[in-house]
Amino acid sequence: MDNFQFFIAGEKDIPELTRVMTVAFDDDARTHLGEEKGGPPGYDDGEFFQKWMLAHDESIGYKIVVDNTVIGGFIVWVLPDGVDFLGTMFVDPDYQNRAVGPQAWQLIEAAYPQTKSWTLGTPKWAIRNHYFYEEKCGFTKIGEQLDDEEGMLVYMYIKGMV
């Protein structure tokens, strides 16, 4: 098993996080959609992290590192009402199925014990994500909604009590 470490990410980490996010999201697009590229706006040019990690006081980005190499990341939103949000989580396909995601989720829960519940959204077509969040992390699907920015159906999940 690899020795993963988690660090708060900053602006200097955006190029490497963007590289890994691009590889991970494009792999999902090929696997589930038969398309060469696919991800949220700005996922492949750094704009995603500028917009969602740096521009808001409530959001905190993390990088997942093994042997001094960034292999994944995630962004959490810690909100005043205690209903916090997992904005994104991604792992380089070369490191998937090695317990990186579950370890990252355990870290998140341990780091934010004041959280009453966690919410997240993931694309309907992202079957591996559904399994991961439901079976590995204990989330429950609570509905579906259309993502206005991307125009795709998103499954909404929750863990904990509201």
Residues of each region from the PLM?
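A short, internal acetyl-CoA/4′-phosphopantetheine-binding micro-motif in the GNAT/acyltransferase core
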Residues: 89-96, 122-124
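A conserved beta-turn-beta hairpin within the catalytic core of GNAT-like acetyltransferases
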Residues: 78-87, 96, 114, 151-153
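Conserved GNAT acetyl-CoA-binding A-motif
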Residues: 111-124
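Conserved acetyl-CoA-binding loop-helix of GNAT-fold acetyltransferases
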Residues: 91, 97-110, 135
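Conserved beta-strand in the GNAT
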Residues: 61-63, 69-78, 85, 90
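Conserved N-terminal entry element of GNAT/NAT acetyltransferase domains
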Residues: 1-12
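Conserved GNAT-fold acetyl-CoA-binding loop/helix
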Residues: 25-50, 59
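Conserved active-site tyrosine of GNAT-family acetyltransferases
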Residues: 133-134, 139
